[in-house]
Amino acid sequence: MDWLLLDDKINKLMRKVAQLNGDEYHESFYNPHPYPGWCPELKHMMWGFIKELKEKESAGVATKVDLQTLSELFDIIIRLSDLSLTENKFQQNTNAFGEAVTAFNYKLLNAITEANDSEVKNVFISPGRLQAILVLMSNWVGWYMREQILEAICCKEMDPMEVNEMFADERYIIPYASKEDLEEGYVPTIDLKTMMWYQKGQNLDKRGLIDIEKPFNVHFKNIDFRSPSAMGKINSEVEKASHGLIKNLQVELTEETRALLMDVFYFKANWQSRFDEDNTRTRNFYYKGGCSKVKMMSQTDDFRYYENDTFQSISLDYNSNVHTRDYSMWIHLPKQGHKIKEVLTQITEERIGPKYEQKEVHLLLPRFEIETTTSLCEVLKMMGMEEMFASEDAIPNLLSNVRIYDIVQQGKITVNETGTEAAMATYCPMCLGCPPDVKPTPIEMNVNHEFIFEIVETYTGNRLFSGIVNKL
């Protein structure tokens, strides 16, 4: 037998195994060092098998296993090892992206509070969809702008293709459910549509289409922006995709409009623990400079809950089934004497999710409906994306000589006794150029003043929506 060839194949496999754990592998055929690898049983099995074959060959005993069979076996094992390496890298990227999603959410909320008078205005955004749109656009921009985008969205440690890969399974956020399940509210209703409208006569660069088809499923639509019917066609698509929540985009089409990138996300889900309408009462909601009368829902139940000296936080779960991801609304309520900015600072610096514990809580939560339109141009500049709005040729890998003059999020959310319904249109116009024995008293959480809310996909931590309610 060609033992040197087998030795080379085994060392290749062991080197792959070492890579899985980030260790060094020192090649040694006759005296392999003990290796606490990804599959130590495989290593011992292989070395034992080879030792037995060598002993039989030395003793002149014929073996039924030939070199070709062994080589093919080791090739298969090496390919499986390659697959494990790929999966391991994907898992590392998934974990890193989960951290990036959380970091970007709070980075964005902090920037918005700095840029706007957020103690008066309500804030409603979709960090997850903004991040997706920015990643999509990073495929079309130059390298310098791409670096700015990836750093701003907290993904600078990943290369563009790896970031794209994180969105390749976006279709799986759509629940697998029967029509009856959806109609009865047993699972969330989720819709997502991304469209790129571009001026008739403009030619798309095929370079910009290669890497985005699977991750983003963009629908490219040719239109004459100068036509009187153009805005009507666009609004019709928005209204359909948002299930009627958003009817008219707050955007003006001009003679110089060359493209409109648009992403519409819709979410509707029922509470796992619904509020009884009979318990809803008219109560005060306090805001800076006054108070208003609101319909305050209430219930006492076991919730995931956390508090410290600065704020209370609660997780309200939505209905789901085994085929869907889990979704929750997190509410962060400043304690008396503390402000939204203090809470934002703390939840930015520490992970709240793992700190939740099951507690009995008497919760008072207002019904609310918020409708906002938020220009993010200045906010994104503050976050380091100045080049995006300065370039006269912003997306050369898709359309030449176009300038991005804003990125806007326009959305609506309704929260009531049954659950939550929300939609967000993100658009980018472009122009030319264990329980104790004694049951404790339920924790009181009275959401009767400013608070932060997030709708979170539990597994990845993706923030579908976030907001700050200052006044009702």
Ranges and model annotations:
Residues 11, 18, 51, 77-79, ...:
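Residues marking helix boundaries in flexible regions
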Residues 33, 74-472:
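Secretory/exported precursors with cleavable N-terminal leaders
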Residues 22-36, 55-67:
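Charged, low-complexity interaction regions
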Residues 4, 8, 29, 341-342:
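Gram-negative host-targeted secretion-system effectors, predominantly Type III and Type IV
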